[in-house]
């Protein structure tokens, strides 16, 4: 069953990306980035909708050219999730997408240009009430910082970030968040820890260029898990060389593991051994695939034998403890009279899980109504 997280989050200011609150205790937002060509409007819209379907709170879109900016205008008209425009080199592109309703501007201090160009972007953002993300990356630091430190260090990344924080402060602009990403876990973690001590603005977390689906997920879970467990972080992106949809799933899994934010089913499943009375692995895989559309937070334990099965089931919303021929079924920690045939588990479990999700959703709605009264 759901348990409260013991994590005490870092205090930060509040900004809004579209209608999504960021910082000051708001739920940690999970975002991804499209990997289509932005000028391919149909493909980009389709990918954004796929990301939104699995729970993306925010989607970032690369806008490298003026042609891409014109495409962004069309994309923005066809989706509802807030969009961040990723801007490098040409500050004029930021000004253009601002006209087209962008929800946030991401600029890279290492290549956006001199202070006068930043001032132009900030003035535009202020006039149109658009927040900015200062996005520092260990692979694209300013030349003078590279020369000063000779290699990326936490101090180098934070100095780059603080240069631009100071510019925004001088321009009296406080609607921004900051990221200091690196592909090395310790470098990224050290950079965020250092930055968290120096500013009050929201922090966007990420291990950049983390790798493929498996290795990148592990690296991100380790790095972001360290920071999140310390209360650091207000938004996150899992950077994978994989389908962006997987980034959202992994992001929510990390938050779910730390009890920070839950979306969908938390399956508690044994790795299986010779004691299993049914095929645990295929059962869990089938249920995960079938139930991707369920967003209700709930714990479901699927354990193949009676050693740990009853204990896990007693602390889950629903649970299955394997036994010969027919397995024991639990609801809200209590064993039910009904038993499930081990050769016909998936359909029955799916039906039970969907029914339980409906009950929990109704209870949550009643709770909210009572609070409003």
Swiss-Prot record:
Molecular function terms, GO-annotated: 4 iron, 4 sulfur cluster binding; 4-hydroxy-3-methylbut-2-en-1-yl diphosphate synthase activity (ferredoxin); 4-hydroxy-3-methylbut-2-enyl-diphosphate synthase activity (flavodoxin); iron ion binding
Catalysed reactions, semicolon-separated: (2E)-4-hydroxy-3-methylbut-2-enyl diphosphate + oxidized [flavodoxin] + H2O + 2 H(+) = 2-C-methyl-D-erythritol 2,4-cyclic diphosphate + reduced [flavodoxin]
Cofactor(s) listed in the protein's UniProt record: [4Fe-4S] cluster
Biological process annotations from GO: isopentenyl diphosphate biosynthetic process, methylerythritol 4-phosphate pathway; terpenoid biosynthetic process
Highest taxon, organism lineage: Bacteria
UniProt cross-references to InterPro entries, sorted A to Z: Dihydropteroate_synth-like_sf, IspG_bac, IspG_bac-typ, NO2/SO3_Rdtase_4Fe4S_sf
Pfam families to which the protein is assigned, alphabetical: GcpE
Enzyme class label: oxidoreductase
Residues annotated to bind [4Fe-4S] cluster: 270, 273, 305, 312
Binding note for cofactor: Binds 1 [4Fe-4S] cluster.
Cystine pairings recorded for this chain: none
EC number: 1.17.7.3
Cited Gene3D superfamilies: Dihydropteroate synthase-like (3.20.20.20), Sulfite Reductase Hemoprotein, domain 1 (3.30.413.10)
Keyword Cell division: no
Pathway(s) this gene product operates in, as recorded in its UniProt entry: Isoprenoid biosynthesis; isopentenyl diphosphate biosynthesis via DXP pathway; isopentenyl diphosphate from 1-deoxy-D-xylulose 5-phosphate: step 5/6
Keyword tags: 4Fe-4S, Iron, Iron-sulfur, Isoprene biosynthesis, Metal-binding, Oxidoreductase
HAMAP family according to UniProt: IspG (MF_00159)
PANTHER family for the chain: 4-HYDROXY-3-METHYLBUT-2-EN-1-YL DIPHOSPHATE SYNTHASE (PTHR30454), 4-HYDROXY-3-METHYLBUT-2-EN-1-YL DIPHOSPHATE SYNTHASE (FERREDOXIN), CHLOROPLASTIC (PTHR30454:SF0)
Family designation: Belongs to the IspG family.
Task of the protein: Converts 2C-methyl-D-erythritol 2,4-cyclodiphosphate (ME-2,4cPP) into 1-hydroxy-2-methyl-2-(E)-butenyl 4-diphosphate.
Protein name: 4-hydroxy-3-methylbut-2-en-1-yl diphosphate synthase (flavodoxin)
UniProt source species: Vibrio atlanticus (strain LGP32)
Classification lineage: Bacteria, Pseudomonadati, Pseudomonadota, Gammaproteobacteria, Vibrionales
């Amino acid at each position: 069953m759901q348990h409260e997280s013991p994590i005490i989050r870092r205090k930060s200011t509040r900004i809004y990306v579209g209608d999504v609150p960021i910082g000051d205790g708001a739920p940690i937002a999970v975002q991804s980035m499209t990997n289509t060509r932005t000028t391919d409007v149909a493909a980009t819209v389709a990918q954004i909708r796929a990301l939104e379907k699995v729970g993306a709170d925010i989607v970032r879109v690369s806008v490298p050219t003026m042609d891409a900016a014109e495409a962004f205008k069309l994309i923005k008209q066809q989706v509802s999730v807030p969009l961040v425009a990723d801007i490098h080199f040409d500050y004029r592109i930021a000004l253009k997408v601002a006209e087209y309703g962008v929800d946030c501007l991401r600029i890279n201090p290492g290549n956006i240009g001199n202070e006068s160009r930043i001032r132009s972007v900030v003035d535009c953002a202020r006039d149109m009430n658009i927040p900015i993300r200062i996005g520092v990356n260990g692979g694209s630091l300013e030349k003078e910082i590279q020369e000063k430190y000779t290699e990326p260090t936490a101090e180098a990344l934070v100095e780059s970030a603080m240069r631009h924080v100071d510019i925004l402060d001088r321009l009296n602009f406080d609607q921004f968040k900051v990221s200091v990403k690196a592909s090395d876990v310790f470098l990224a973690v050290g950079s965020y820890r250092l930055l968290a001590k120096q500013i009050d603005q929201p922090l966007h977390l990420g291990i950049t260029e983390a790798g493929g689906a498996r290795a990148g997920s592990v690296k991100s879970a380790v790095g972001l898990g360290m920071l999140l467990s310390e209360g650091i972080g207000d938004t996150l992106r899992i950077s994978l060389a994989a389908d962006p949809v997987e980034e959202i799933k992994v992001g929510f899994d990390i938050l779910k593991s730390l009890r920070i934010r839950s979306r969908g089913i938390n399956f508690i499943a044994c790795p299986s051994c010779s004691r299993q009375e049914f095929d645990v692995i295929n059962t869990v895989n089938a249920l995960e695939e079938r139930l991707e559309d369920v967003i209700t937070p709930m714990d479901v334990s699927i354990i193949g034998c009676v050693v740990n099965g009853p204990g896990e089931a007693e602390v889950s919303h629903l649970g299955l403890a394997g036994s010969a021929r027919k397995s024991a079924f639990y609801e809200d920690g209590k064993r039910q009279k009904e038993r499930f045939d081990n050769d016909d588990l998936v359909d029955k479990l799916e039906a039970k899980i969907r029914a339980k999700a409906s009950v929990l959703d109704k209870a949550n709605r009643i709770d909210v109504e009572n609070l409003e009264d």
